UniProtKB/Swiss-Prot annotation:
PROSITE patterns found in the cross-reference section: MPN (PS50249)
UniProtKB keywords: Acetylation, Isopeptide bond, Proteasome, Ubl conjugation
InterPro entries: EIF3F/CSN6-like_C (IPR024969), JAMM/MPN+_dom (IPR000555), MPN (IPR037518), MPN_RPN7_8 (IPR033858)
Annotated family: Belongs to the peptidase M67A family.
Species the sequence originates in: Mus musculus (Mouse)
Protein name: 26S proteasome non-ATPase regulatory subunit 7
Length: 321
């Protein structure tokens, strides 16, 4: 397989925000299932840095994938204006909101190659169902068939990640300040991340199973590169039938369960101590409150007796006069 022109795509938060805004605006006007736009950025060796984007008018027939329209005149005018602002940002590819590849993506990508020979497609999921990266990057390659038929264009997956400069990080933190739940601890976050990771693994395994079933039934041609990579994955799996592996697994599990048990005991003892301390504090507070009430009653009684004695003295003085 030929070496890819790009090995990693870095998408900036500004691009994600622009795409979501584009999707929300178009969704209110019409019922388009996806929106399309152009990606701007720069190349650094084999890393593509996508720092900006703009929307492009796009429409397609829901029934016939071969019928679609992309306004390239609007594209050229918008790119001319963006180039005046920042000449270093060039057209590096295009995006759509998918959430999966479409049959006419190859044809659209061929059109985008007029402006960028190594055009990259980034699918941005604006309504993700699970936590994780909302981006999937692809680049078109020539696929050679084993049966001698002519080569055809297909998409090759490229690693993607979210990256930001310092100013963008400050802006994103400011936007997320009111969304973050400060009551959630690190433990719950770790457990949530592991659960979502297992869900993602399950989804990938189902995709692999579906692919292998289609290849076995003859619905898809054999791609030796994919088969070799799957074989490498299977070779890395541990042999669960080995007695040593089973013993090591049980020992590791028992150690972890002992730690969990001790943590539960310590938590119970601490809670019991807190309960006792709370009861003692409440008892002392009640005693103090009772003493204060008794003292206030005694003071009021003394004041009344003093008032009576003063009144009696005044009466005696009047009688003497």
């Amino acid at each position: 397989m030929p070496e890819l022109a790009v090995q990693k795509v870095v998408v900036h938060p500004l691009v994600l925000l622009s795409v979501v805004d584009h999707f929300n605006r178009i969704g209110k006007v019409g019922n388009q299932k996806r929106v399309v736009g152009v990606l701007l950025g720069s190349w650094q060796k084999k890393v593509l840095d996508v720092s900006n984007s703009f929307a492009v008018p796009f429409d397609e027939d829901d029934k016939d994938d071969s019928v679609w329209f992309l306004d390239h005149d609007y594209l050229e005018n918008m790119y001319g204006m963006f180039k005046k602002v920042n000449a270093r940002e060039r057209i590096v590819g295009w995006y759509h909101t998918g959430p999966k590849l479409h049959k006419n993506d190859i044809a659209i990508n061929e059109l985008m190659k007029r402006y960028c020979p190594n055009s990259v497609l980034v699918i941005i999921d604006v309504k993700p169902k699970d936590l994780g990266l909302p981006t999937e990057a692809y680049i078109s390659v020539e696929e050679v068939h084993d049966d001698g038929t002519p080569t055809s264009k297909t998409f090759e997956h490229v690693t993607s990640e979210i990256g930001a400069e310092e100013a963008e990080e400050v802006g994103v933190e400011h936007l997320l300040r009111d969304i973050k739940d400060t009551t959630v601890g690190t433990l719950s976050q770790r457990i949530t991340n592991q659960v979502h990771g297992l869900k993602g693994l399950n989804s990938k395994l189902l995709d692999i199973r579906s692919y292998l079933e289609k290849v076995a039934s003859g619905k898809l041609p054999i791609n030796h590169q994919i088969i070799y990579q799957l074989q490498d994955v299977f070779n890395l799996l541990p042999d669960a039938s080995l007695q040593e592996f089973v013993k090591a697994f049980y020992l590791k599990t028992n150690d972890q369960m002992v730690v969990v048990y001790l943590a539960s005991l310590i938590r119970s003892v601490v809670a019991l101590h807190n309960l006792i301390n709370n009861k003692i504090a409440n008892r002392d507070a009640e005693k103090k409150e009772g003493q204060e009430k008794e003292e206030s009653k005694k003071e009021r009684k003394d004041d009344k007796e003093k008032e009576k004695s003063d009144a009696a003295k005044k009466e005696e003085k009047k009688e003497k006069k």
